[in-house]
Amino acid sequence: MLQQFTLLFLYLSIASAKTITGVFDSFNSLTWSNAANYAFKGPGYPTWNAVLGWSLDGTSANPGDTFTLNMPCVFKYTTSQTSVDLTADGVKYATCQFYSGEEFTTFSTLTCTVNDALKSSIKAFGTVTLPIAFNVGGTGSSTDLEDSKCFTAGTNTVTFNDGDKDISIDVEFEKSTVDPSGYLYASRVMPSLNKVTTLFVAPQCENGYTSGTMGFSSSNGDVAIDCSNIHIGITKGLNDWNYPVSSESFSYTKTCTSNGIQIKYQNVPAGYRPFIDAYISATDVNQYTLAYTNDYTCAGSRSQSKPFTLRWTGYKNSDAGSNGIVIVATTRTVTDSTTAVTTLPFNPSVDKTKTIEILQPIPTTTITTSYVGVTTSYSTKTAPIGETATVIVDVPYHTTTTVTSEWTGTITTTTTRTNPTDSIDTVVVQVPSPNPTVSTTEYWSQSYATTTTVTAPPGGTDTVIIREPPNHTVTTTEYWSQSFATTTTVTAPPGETDTVIIREPPNHTVTTTEYWSQSYATTTTVTAPPGGTDTVLIREPPNHTVTTTEYWSQSYATTTTVTAPPGGTDTVIIREPPNYTVTTTEYWSQSYATTTTITAPPGETDTVIIREPPNHTVTTTEYWSQSYATTTTVTAPPGGTDTVLIREPPNHTVTTTEYWSQSYATTTTVTAPPGGTDTVLIREPPNHTVTTTEYWSQSYATTTTVTAPPGGTDTVIIREPPNHTVTTTEYWSQSYATTTTVTAPPGGTDTVIIREPPNYTVTTTEYWSQSFATTTTVTAPPGGTDTVIIYESMSSSKISTSSNDITSIIPSFSRPHYVNSTTSDLSTFESSSMNTPTSISSDGMLLSSTTLVTESETTTESICSDGKECSRLSSSSGIVTNPDSNESSIVTSTVPTASTMSDSLSSTDGISATSSDNVSKSGVSVTTETSVTTIQTTPNPLSSSVTSLTQLSSIPSVSESESKVTFTSNGDNQSGTHDSQSTSTEIEIVTTSSTKVLPPVVSSNTDLTSEPTNTREQPTTLSTTSNSITEDITTSQPTGDNGDNTSSTNPVPTVATSTLASASEEDNKSGSHESASTSLKPSMGENSGLTTSTEIEATTTSPTEAPSPAVSSGTDVTTEPTDTREQPTTLSTTSKTNSESVATTQATNENGGKSPSTDLTSSLTTGTSASTSANSELVTSGSVTGGAVASASNDQSHSTSVTNSNSIVSNTPQTTLSQQVTSSSPSTNTFIASTYDGSGSIIQHSTWLYGLITLLSLFI
């Protein structure tokens, strides 16, 4: 019972084992190590180390499963091992046996068996290194001849396979360094047989061999030749390692013993080389000596005898074994389709014979048939073991067309160009251009003939010397036409009979020809002695006559008689015009065609009957557009193939197009039987995609994909709702208008910037009864003329001016000097004489105004020495009062100023003034140091009568500021025809202050459009810096039309305010921001140019409470719907202001006088980090929201003053004075200040005083 169970288990184990593939999955490397000091890296030299990757998965492989690695063109394993284990982490998962192909097969194998260590839960992988040597030939065996073509010198691809899994690697093989034209030899060890194959190739003879003797032997008795394993042949070529690639039989005589082998040969054709190889057994296969016989005679050359002796050594293969056992190779026939090698079980301690069994498939006999065609077909008639199977190969053969041409080479080449699609090949024979040949034939005393060719170099003349034995001679005498006698010897080819011809001059001859009754002709010559007259009598029978009737192309008949010589046949040719012909073609039952012509008499009609065998028929079924079926037979010409065309109505078709991952398109049609439905499946590669983003009128975004036909480009159209748009109109220095749209990303805000040329300005000054001065600007539409109305107070003022030289330029003042300051807040607003309350329905706010009046006093003292350098000391103080309030805001400012100015020529107080005939050449250098101390107390500047918003301003603020200002101005005269000043001023301001900013308001004369606003107001604290700049502009005296001095001043300063950061809800949560970059740039006429660049760096830390936005009077306001969430924000602002000043110079009038034309277009740009921008257009003597006030006069005072007061600008969109202001966030508290002299003239200030007043405006 146990035995039966054991047998059953063994049977089940064997039955469950299977062959698996794909275990060897990568060819990692193939490197060469020189095992025996070889001269080059040849594929057949040991050792090539192949590193292969393998993997075993326990879920698909089981213990006992086998897998085999086939290694084509591998000769042997160069190792003493017989197997190798596939090991991972020290565990053997499979054992692989080495089987070398050697001389038995063209490949080697590695046969492996899975071990029990592989479990279903294990997946093992690793690498294995196999030491091998490749087979690139070396003998004349069929195995070596096939493998001799495996590789070539250079880069090769080595491919092994494990079932259907191929693994490859590229490797570089070096060519043999041995000269292939000399004698060649090779030796190779076969470890499995413990024998050596030895090869010997005769030296090269280009023109072939006349004879030769070659072979090898051993005189020491340590080598035995195996005469049963010898290959002798001639090869037509060698591979890159000097091994034969072919073997053909030839004529030779062989002598073989155990001590040596030798052959004698003769007449080997050109292009071939004899070779011999044999198996030898040596006492030590790694060290033995052979003596080589090497005698040969090249065609056309002398005999050569060059024997040599070689002592062979090699690497020792431990597989050879030293116990002297006999190794026998046996062959067994199996039913497999390939040849395999196996070693039968062998115990070296018991067995004395080791058997290597070669498993060969059933032998086959090949029967080859041929036909004219292109493709080869194979068929096999199988047979059982012991018999021979038959393989029938139907081989196509081609007919050939030979083209012969000459070339410059020395040998004849034949190239066959095989036509892959037709059965006619072209054989191109290139014959070397032959040397001219001179043949000389001479007789000698020998009884045989010889021919010797003396070959000259190419381009020379070859000489062929023929030596012949003497011929026999026959003498013939004959008459000839000459009047003298000659004797000529006609030499026959050697071995034949020469003829001696004696030619005598002929006798005179009389010939008589006559016809007679006989049917034959006779000629009778009556010969006279030499010198006499011979008589020739010719008797001829009458000629026969043949009449031939033929047709020709003419329309008439002729008869022609052609007379033949006597004994010939006269011909009568009758030519008739051709008959008409009727041809009838009919099919008959025979397999051949005939043509029968029934000829009618001339002038009638001939009949041609063509009988053809029936044509072959091919039936084709196709679909057409009709709804019914038809059958049409297309009859081919006789001998062709008739076509039966069956047209069926088309099947219904269902077409399906789908995209797939490949880069090409395919169309597959599944054809149903007639009457069914065909399916067309189109697979297209995915189209390229172009994405386009556009805006549309809806409030939401969509994405649409427009699919193009296959091969086109799909379009993804993203439609975004339109961005909000903020339109800003500003003036610039050009004479034309432009519109620029700055498009933000989707969801942002687009900005439309309209740039208009500045309007002309007309300034009117009036006096009124109020105690303060105001300036009202009536802004015309772009292209019109703006009007600046200045209302002056009639109250008195006092200005103390101490100057030695400036009295001629700056007049003294008889009444007080006022600076009118107006602060707009959320609850009140008053501008000029207007005081009309206005309310906003959506917010329910009450608007009014509060006027703050500042009275200031300025004392200036100028000291000049030698007219070259002037010093000026100026101080000013002011008081701000609110007439409508019970409490006053008092500002006490002390501004001591010291300045030094110098120029190259004499001037007044450092300011250049010129008459009509004098142009200043001076530059101005000003160095100013200013110290400002301000103490401000502001209990409540608002009127207590406004009860609805009293709490907004009930918190008093006390501000103490200490500032140190340093002005450094360097002048540079950059004049052309007309002189100008260029001044660069750097101002550094450090200020610490605490300021409460009141809510801004909208004036009563404002056209206000309000839309619903969803506003959640929360306190906002800003840290800000506000600068006020007063700029001096000096105008020289020009000459009028007739030389008089006239002045035309048209100052148009432009102030633009912009932000340095973008506003958002999140931005208001930040700590500090940098902002305030102010640049005042004049645009001047062509006759004047003064450029002043002022850089102001101000660092200010000041908490400011910024309430709701407000816009001053004269401004059209549009409020857009917004959703604003105001949150407490503390901003630290740094302002940097650039200010430029312009002084006009003399211009020449068209009548010869000088008339200055001053076009002052100053651009002041201010930015804050509170994420807002406000652009204002400032016209002379105009009131500007969030910007400045400037005034100018056109009289002869030559004095123009521009005061630019910048206030806090917070979260304000871009705004233009004459355009709409759009705001949905806290806006600007406007502080406007103007300086007058009380008489309609504007007080003149220098550039440094302009910057000083800017500083003072922070605190006043």
Curated annotation (Swiss-Prot):
GO biological process terms, alphabetically, are: adhesion of symbiont to host; cell adhesion; cell adhesion involved in multi-species biofilm formation; cell adhesion involved in single-species biofilm formation; cell-cell adhesion; cellular response to neutral pH; filamentous growth; filamentous growth of a population of unicellular organisms
Which pairs of positions does the record mark as disulfide bonds? 73-150, 96-112, 205-298, 227-256
Give the bilayer topology. Answer: Lipid-anchor; GPI-anchor
After translation, the protein is modified as follows: The GPI-anchor is attached to the protein in the endoplasmic reticulum and serves to target the protein to the cell surface. There, the glucosamine-inositol phospholipid moiety is cleaved off and the GPI-modified mannoprotein is covalently attached via its lipidless GPI glycan remnant to the 1,6-beta-glucan of the outer cell wall layer.
Q: Which GO terms describe its molecular function?
A: fibronectin binding; laminin binding; peptide binding
Keyword tags: Cell adhesion, Cell membrane, Cell wall, Disulfide bond, Glycoprotein, GPI-anchor, Lipoprotein, Membrane, Repeat, Secreted, Signal, Virulence
User: Which residues, in ranges, are excised as the propeptide?
Assistant: 1239-1260
Q: Region Disordered: list its residue ranges.
A: 896-924, 954-1226
- Give me the stretches of Polar residues compositional bias: 896-918, 964-979, 1002-1062, 1073-1090, 1111-1154
Source species, domain of life: Eukaryota
**Stored InterPro entries:** Adhesion_dom_sf, Agglutinin-like_ALS_rpt, Agglutinin-like_N, Agglutinin-like_N_N2, ALS, Fibrogen-bd_dom1
Q: Where are the ALS repeats?
A: 365-396, 401-432, 438-469, 474-505, 510-541, 546-577, 582-613, 618-649, 654-685, 690-721, 726-757, 762-791
Q: Which residues are glycosylated?
A: 471, 507, 543, 579, 615, 651, 687, 723, 759, 820, 886, 918, 973, 1045, 1068
UniProt lists compositionally biased (Low complexity) regions at 980-995, 1091-1110, 1155-1176, 1197-1226
The record places the lipid (GPI-anchor amidated glycine) at 1238
- Leader peptide range in chain numbering: 1-17
Presence of keyword GTP-binding: no
Main localization of the protein described in the UniProt heading: membrane
Q: What is known of its domains?
A: Each ALS protein has a similar three-domain structure, including a N-ter domain of 433-436 amino acids that is 55-90 percent identical across the family and which mediates adherence to various materials; a central domain of variable numbers of tandemly repeated copies of a 36 amino acid motif; and a C-ter domain that is relatively variable in length and sequence across the family.
Q: Which family does it belong to?
A: Belongs to the ALS family.
- State the function annotated in the UniProt record: Major cell surface adhesion protein which mediates both yeast-to-host tissue adherence and yeast aggregation. Acts as a downstream effector of the EFG1 regulatory pathway. Required for rapamycin-induced aggregation of C.albicans. Binds glycans and mediates adherence to endothelial and epithelial cells, thereby playing an important role in the pathogenesis of C.albicans infections.
The name under which this protein is listed is Agglutinin-like protein 1
Source organism: Candida albicans (strain SC5314 / ATCC MYA-2876) (Yeast)
Q: Which gene encodes it?
A: ALS1
